Regions:
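A short, basic N-terminal segment
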Residues: 1-44
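C-terminal engagement/docking regions of AAA+ P-loop ATPases
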Residues: 227-244
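Conserved catalytic/switch belt of AAA+ P-loop NTPases
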Residues: 39-43, 109, 113-152
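Walker A/P-loop
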Residues: 1-10, 40-79, 93-96, 124-129
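Conserved AAA+ ATPase "SRH/arginine-finger" region at the nucleotide-binding site
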Residues: 79-81, 155-168
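Short glycine-rich substrate-engagement loop in P-loop NTPases that contacts/grips substrate
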Residues: 31-36, 73-106, 117
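Conserved AAA+ ATPase "sensor/coupling" helix adjacent to the nucleotide-binding pocket
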Residues: 153, 169-182, 216-217
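C-terminal helical "lid" of AAA+/P-loop NTPase domains
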Residues: 194-199, 205-220, 231-234
Length: 244
């Protein structure tokens, strides 16, 4: 039977390195920097219904998980990809039961834009009467993809693609952290880190996945893994123009 350590390291690198708190969270300082509105809402457990809108890999799901770890409310993680009206009704029933006993329910719906208008309508009465606090995550413009009545009851927070320096910081953390490659000797230049970051287009998950692939496919000599620009280009199937 695999040990917990082995099972953990079978997880993809982005999952292993997912931050547990806001101090570890990288980027989105306009929302979660010291004194900013979303940080205050999370730290005071004063969450109201909201939509996280931004491109892939910028921290939407991570912020929801941080909220889950800080709130005293019941937290339900829900995917629009694998759920339908039946599952929505079951969750709403659970939320109603929680409300009877004085417990709030936060419902996180990943890829909420995947729900059609009628499915989104099913949330509306429960949001209106406070049975659930809805947190939706979407890569699509909420004005076009979210029911207007539901959207009017949610605060939209816009998450931006990460800056290259933010990505480089994440990559360095991945190399040094015991949850990443901290137990390995890795030779990788700052130029190579910036190259991976530039290829990621502000997507932290993409950058970390690329780093994992690059390290797993780099040559080892005398116990040291040597990362080159060539292997990065091979793994990403992209050619560097800025770093030649």
């Amino acid at each position: 039977m695999a040990s917990l350590f082995e099972e953990t390291f079978n997880e993809p690198l982005p999952s292993r390195l997912r931050p547990d708190n806001l101090d570890e969270f990288v980027g989105q300082t306009h929302l979660v920097g010291k004194g900013k509105i979303l940080r205050r809402l999370i730290e005071t457990d004063s969450i109201s219904s909201m939509i996280f809108w931004g491109p892939p890999g910028v921290g939407k799901t991570t912020l929801a998980r941080i909220i889950a770890s800080h709130t005293h409310s019941s937290f339900i993680d829900f995917s629009a990809v694998t759920s339908g009206i039946k599952e929505i009704r079951e969750v709403m029933k659970q939320a109603e039961n929680n409300r009877v006993f004085g417990e709030k329910t936060i419902l996180f719906v990943d890829e909420i834009h995947r729900f059609n208008k009628s499915q989104q309508d099913a949330f509306l009465p429960f949001v209106e009467k406070g049975s659930i606090i809805l947190i939706g995550a979407t890569t699509e413009n909420p004005s076009f993809e979210i029911n207007g009545a539901l959207l009017s009851r949610c605060k939209v927070f816009v998450l931006n693609a990460l800056e290259e320096e933010d990505i480089v910081s994440l990559l360095k953390h991945a190399i040094s952290s015991p949850k990443g490659f901290g137990n390995m000797k890795i030779d990788i230049s700052d130029d190579c880190l910036h190259l991976i970051a530039s290829f990621s287009n502000g997507d932290a998950r993409n950058a970390l996945s690329t780093l994992e692939m690059v390290i797993n496919n780099s040559d080892e000599k005398d116990g040291i893994i040597h990362v080159s620009k060539t292997i990065i280009e091979q793994c990403t199937q992209k050619k560097s123009l800025l770093y030649d």
